[in-house]
Amino acid sequence: MKPTKYLLSLLLSGALPCAGAPFVPAPHAPLAPTSGEKAADSTVVSSPRQLNEATVTAHAEATRLKYAPQALTLLSARQIDGSASSLNEVLGRVAGVTIRSMGGVGSSSRISVRGLEGKRMGLYIDGTSAGQISNFVSLDDIPTDMIERVEVYKGIVPYRFGGTAMGGAVNVVLKDYPPRYLDASYEVGSYNTHRANSVFKRSFADLGLELGLGGLFVASDNDYEMTLHNLNDLRVRRGNDAFRKAVLGGSIKETKWWFDELKSEFILTSTRQGIQGIDWDYRSAHNHASSFLVSLEAKRKNFFVEGLDFDFSTAYNIGRYGLCDTARVRHAWDGRTYPTLSPLGGETGPFASDGHHRSHDWIGKLNLEYTLRPDHALNLNLYGTGTWQQPHNELMDRSLGYPGNFDSRLTALTTGLSYEAFFFDRRLQTAVTAKHFLIGSRAKMLHNFYLRDIKTIHINRSEWGANFAACYRITPLWTVKGSVASEVRIPTSEELLGNSFNILPSPDLLPERNKSVNAGVLYRRSFSDDRVWEAEVNVYMSELTDMVRFTPDLLPTMARYTNFGQVRTMGIEAEIKADVTRWCYLYANGTWQDLRDRRRTFPNSKAPNPTYDLRIPNIPYLMANFGGELHWADLFGRRQNTRLLLDASYVHRYSYDFEMGAYLEKLIPTSLTFDAAIEQSFANRRWTLTLKVKNLADRETVSEFNRPLPGRTCSVKLRYLLR
């Protein structure tokens, strides 16, 4: 059984095929892999253990995905249950993927795939979008214990996911659970960091009823020391970066009614996060958020018509959030105090803030798949979203002298029609997709916070996109893949409407359009003793027009999204991983990517652009990861497992501004970090004890516009599993 699509630690439901997988042919049709391959292989198995039926099914699904036409990296339980404490740390070791964080545990972070980042990335849990509610829950909230595998799509996003993701997607597939299951863990680490999560499931087979309950709690002071290079290398300790988050959820599922599966879920969240200053020593400013989500899902095969599969899901989330900044003085790092810019307070900017905003978010997805013949299928996907923001910040309005926050609405509908087919004894797989996008928004905005210039904007847009992907198995060991796409991404609610405290509305943003091509080759060899060797190389090129970028506003501490222009991307990535022996696993990957500004002139003018053909700033262009694992069974006694893990990450220095003139010195230095872990399990993995050390050499690392990151950290984790 799987937890909720929106936060895995919480809700438990029945096993289902991954939404991004190729369609499953009729029972008499042969399934890939072809002869000479095994459906389950060691690249998707964690440490040696007995596999139940659900696990074998999940492994067969992962093997099918390796031969899907999309460019794809699979992260197995072996790679997830390693030295990482969070999903972001796991994703940061994937070829072509970078994670840019602003600080320690719980800090703002962005996932970048092949240089395309942030809102372009599709974020999914069991095939259902989590991006619409990312202000309240994120992929990084998902405990790694609960993840079966992670699918990182590069380029084309599978049609079944729906939505407007462009250039890449991350889909987290949750573990299947037996009828009775209890999983609880607790981790304590440096800087007073605590992580606790648990999940419980109980099934009543005679009634077809399944109940699930779960939750998590994460807290950290994040009070590590950092060097402020902008203040003559001053060494200070962070004092306002504490993070607290709690989540509780439950689910109920029925499998003996007319629908094959009918499921309802709920999630409660609460978050408080301090705002750490760099130029100034912030003491009390913080963000807060809470939300309540309910969802409903229904599935049925042969929906009134033989061969037609019905999959419907919908969710509604109501959230409250805001920035609290009421400090009456500002603090410099040398201890001196200064008056705030506003007589009403505010240490982070020119205005005081006590936001109590409300947002309503709705998501709905309908997927209809019709199997025309055993090797041919037609798929219709409808994906709709709606957002209604109700900002409320009386203190900020008083600071301005007039209202500066207004209600706004945004609706979007994406319609996708896909055709998937196999040829030549299933050696050739093709998928073609056409999409239509509709978006409508109503909003008011201030063009200038210093002038009461309120403008009402109504927008209705319609766009088309399409893509084609194919893969061909030359031999049982060699597979080639390729794809071409002309895709559109509709700006998100945050990009268009802002967030009512530090991101200003930009309702006149244009949709992004991306033209891309990808080609790759995969070598995969399975051995009779369950070992696997795998190597893959991909080359890619894309051209993004009307690129949306997050840029500072003329108003201090405020920012907005703007259309940047034209960006060309080209790159190559390679990965190799191998079970060298039954007790030794090694991997390595590398990425070179080149993103260039292709605007010949400034927007709306004929003036030449001085940054033409320069590298886009704040995006790494040369990266590598490598590591390995040693594992033994019964090394220190019967029914025990031992694992030793080492992971390394290299990022070559890069600039956080255009490399021209005085900005040549705005460099983020090269980083090489090592993480290690020792894991010992007892009683057939009922008890597991793990010791983790990150950044072994205690190197200084920075990211995201030269923001300092933590040095060496240590943690210990205890997990109890009853099944």
What are these regions (language model features)?
Residues P179, E187, F204-A285:
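Periplasmic-side early beta-strands and strand-to-turn transitions of outer-membrane beta-barrels
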Residues I252-S270, A289-Y450, K455-I457, S462-E463, ...:
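Face-selective signature of the C-terminal outer-membrane beta-barrel domain
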